[in-house]
Swiss-Prot record:
This is Non-structural protein P8. The chain crosses the membrane at residues 119-139, 162-182. Belongs to the orbivirus NS3 family. The keyword Membrane applies. Keywords: Host cell membrane, Host Golgi apparatus, Host membrane, Host-virus interaction, Inhibition of host innate immune response by virus, Membrane, Transmembrane, Transmembrane helix, Viral immunoevasion. It is found in: Host cell membrane; Host Golgi apparatus. GO terms for biological process: symbiont-mediated suppression of host innate immune response. Its main location: host cell. It comes from Bluetongue virus 1 (isolate Australia). It holds the Pfam family Orbi_NS3. It comes from the Viruses. Plays a role in the inhibition of host innate immune response. Interacts with host OPTN and thus inhibits the recruitment of TBK1 to the host Golgi apparatus. In turn, downstream partner IRF3 cannot be activated and IFN-beta production is impaired. Facilitates viral particle release either by increasing plasma membrane permeability through a viroporin-like activity or by viral budding. Forms homooligomers via coiled-coil motif. Interacts with host OPTN; this interaction inhibits innate immune response. One of its GO terms (cellular component) is membrane.
Length: 229
């Protein structure tokens, strides 16, 4: 029994000595020394393009209710500049080339719509003149208006009064043509305004890509230096 106690005491003593050695082997380092070394920031600074894009887009987000077409075109130009500032360099180049390819088609469509609007407008004017003349003729014959020529009274002949039904039909047809032409002209005006706005947006985008960015930084939007002339 005594030998067992001695053996147990020796084991506990050896264990205590081992823990003491392990504790002494640990080196305490100050917290400030244990921190990693501080280096100067080497990462590239974030581009200011998104901030500029947001500022430009803020000008384009104002209310356009009751605004003129010129003001709407101005807001569309601001939006295009903001889009150009926001896009990546490669995406800007792709959009610029696509815009240059679509410009001839847009201008051709715009010219065709303007010619069509001119034809419809002339038809509207002719129909308005016909409707006015037929209305005057019908009204004069219905009222049996008499004219004095060289002191003699001349009334509208009976055969002219018999044309009233036909004149009424012509007047109705001319009025219908006026309504159709007016509606078609309004639709064409909307399409022309939309195409003009689209052309303005694409031209503004291309101008933003091409322009030298010297007003804000030394880097142009194209990603390469532009010669100053």
């Amino acid at each position: 029994m005594l030998s067992g106690l001695i053996q147990r005491f020796e084991e506990e003593k050896m264990k205590h000595n081992q823990e003491r050695v392990e504790e002494l082997s640990l080196v305490r380092v100050d917290d400030t020394i244990s921190q990693p070394p501080r280096y100067a920031p080497s990462a590239p600074m974030p581009s200011s393009m998104p901030t500029v894009a947001l500022e430009i887009l803020d000008k384009a987000m104002s209310n356009t209710t009751g605004a003129t077409q010129t003001q709407k075109a101005e807001k569309a130009a601001f939006a295009s500049y903001a889009e150009a500032f926001r896009d990546d360099v490669r995406l800007r180049q792709i959009n610029r080339h696509v815009n240059e390819q679509i410009f001839p088609k847009l201008k051709s469509d715009l010219g065709g719509l303007k010619k069509k609007r001119a034809i419809i407008h002339m038809t509207l004017l002719v129909a308005a003149v016909v409707a006015l003349l037929t209305s005057v003729c019908t009204l004069s014959s219905d009222m049996s208006v008499a004219f004095k020529l060289n002191g003699t009274s001349a009334e509208i002949p009976q055969w002219f009064k018999s044309l009233n039904p036909m004149l009424g039909v012509v007047n109705l047809g001319a009025t219908f043509i006026m309504m159709v032409c007016a509606k078609s002209e309004r639709g064409l005006n909307q399409q022309i305004d939309m195409i003009k706005k689209e052309v303005m947006k694409k031209q503004s985008y291309n101008d933003a890509v091409r322009m030298s960015f010297t007003e804000f930084s030394s880097v142009p939007l194209d990603g390469f230096e532009l010669p100053l002339t």
